Amino acid sequence: MFAAMPVNEFNQKRFPPFSSASHSAARHLDSMTPLQEIIQQRKLTALFQPILNLKTGEFYGYEGLIRGPSDSPLHSPINLFGAAAQQNLSLEVEMLSRQIVLETFVQLNLPGSLFLNVSPETLLHPSFKNGCTLDFIKKLGLSPERVVIEITENQPTYDFAGMRTALLHYRAMGFQIAIDDLGEGFSSLRLWSELRPEFIKID
C-alpha cells in the first residue's frame, strides 16, 4: 500500500494555450461562465503530493492534483468539478487537468512515478480510449511506465466489465493502475476485486 504525504506546491511558469485565442474568441470571453473561461484560458494549477511505500517508507512518486484560480470560488477541486458536472463539462475539465499535471510534472523534472487521477466516467468515455493520453505523454518525453492511472471514487460506477476492458488497454500500453482510498467511498472492495490494481493508495 502507498500513502500520500502533505501537498507541496511548486513554482511553475504558466503554459500557453494549445492554440492562440482568436480575436473573436476574445470578444466572446465576457459571455462565458467562469468555468468556461477557466477552460479557455487554461487557468488551472498543478500540485504534487509525495507518495510513500507504507511497507518500506521509501519515496515512490507523486500524485498530481489540480486547483482552480486562487481568487475564484472554483479554486477548490470540490467546487471546480462540481461546477463541471452541473455544466456538462466534466470531460473537458478532467482532460485539461490531466494535460496540465503532465506538463508540469515534466517541466519540474520530478523524480519517481506520477499518479494521474482518472474518474470512472472518463475512463469509460470513448474519447479516452483512442490513445490521446499516450500520444500526449510521448510528446512530452515521458514514459508510460512512469504513469499510474489512479481511479478516483468521487462517483459510483457499476460497469466493472467496461472498466476491466479499458484498464487492460492501458496496461498493454505500459501504464499501471491504482485505486484511491480502499475501504472508503462506494464499492471499493468490489472495485479492488474486479480491477486488481498494482497499487492501493491511502490518504
What does each of the following model-derived ranges do?
Residues S20-A83:
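Active-site core of bacterial EAL-family cyclic-dinucleotide phosphodiesterase domains
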Residues S70, A83-N88, V118-L123:
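Conserved protein-kinase N-lobe ATP-binding Lys motif
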Residues I137-D203:
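The catalytic core of metal-dependent phosphodiesterases that act on cyclic dinucleotides
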Residues L47-Q49, L65, F115-S119, E150-T152, ...:
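A cross-family glycoside hydrolase active-site/sugar-binding cleft signature
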Residues L91-G162:
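Catalytic core of bacterial c-di-GMP phosphodiesterases, primarily the EAL and HD-GYP domains
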Residues M1-H23:
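Cyclic-dinucleotide signaling modules
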Residues S70-L74, R98, D181:
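Short acidic-capped amphipathic helix/loop micro-motif used as an active-site/signal-coupling element
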